[in-house]
Amino acid sequence: MKIEEIYNNWKSLFPLSEAHVELLRNKFTTEYNYNSNHIEGNTLTYGQTELLLLFGKVSGEGDLKDFVDMKASQVGVEMVKEAVRDIGMPLTQNFIRQLHKVLLREDYTVYRDLPGGGQTSYTVHAGQYKTRPNSVLTRYGDRFEYASPEETASMMSDLVDWYNAAEQVGKLTPVELAALFHYRYIRIHPFEDGNGRIARLMVNYIMARHGWPMIVIRNRKKAEYLEALHRSDQKIGKVPSGGAYAAIGKITSFLAFMRQTVCEEMQCEIDIVRNADKDTWWYDGQRINFRSENGARLLKLLQAKPFVTFSEMSDSLSVNRSAIQKQIEGFRKKGYLDRRDDGSWHILAMNSKIENYNY
């Protein structure tokens, strides 16, 4: 099915019921922030992310910075949602810098060990373009340079001007606009840190501004995501200006990845809403296929009775205790559930049957 057909099917879901609006909003809040930050190395679990962002609580171990970064990420999401409501306001560099300031919150110093011994340091400035060259060592072993500090401001000015003009012309689709903006932005890499997170927020700014769904680039597809960018880099070359002014026809690999991602995200929402009368279970954007009906029955029981004992589970499901313990351990490893500090079971998988939605 073509992307336009899936988009039309997605649009046909509206207007959504209040229950579905809440369900999909909470789903996106957890899944977007969890995945976008995990791509950059955040260590919070899916359950910790949900508990923090939906319930305002902290549980389990974790680096304080990871908790703070996750909360800041959601503030960035809300900032994007607020900005797209004013369709008459063009994109500005100031908006991007303010978004970066929200994500990083404050300046901080990075210390790095030198190969021959000793240490060097530099300051990352929240909301300010980079003041030192930045580059990345690719997984293929070569060093990839981004725009220099001296050319960054002018390239960002050109990027924003291009976007506003391209939006008015309307030749590119919203997905093409979002993909090309992401690619050009990453080739500039205007900030010392946080560029990937900003790029993904800007994709959703562009998508939502044009009436398309905000999307999640999944951490499980990180290798595919980076490979799509890399293949486009190979086609364009290493010179930063080549990437900063790339044409849509030069980023076919990355555009294909983005189109596929958008299709999958829209289809996921379609399937969830259209299965509102069925007991289908989802986790991190994927439908769960159970080996037997006992899996779904177990999750439903734990959701309804979070303090249920193993003996009660066994009696209720007519399954022996050891089999239940084994299944629960499997579900925990997959992230479908966890156990809270008070001993209660918390289901992280989502049931699309709206009457079972219990946030």
Give the predicted meaning of each segment.
Residues 1-193, 197-359:
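FIC/Doc superfamily catalytic core
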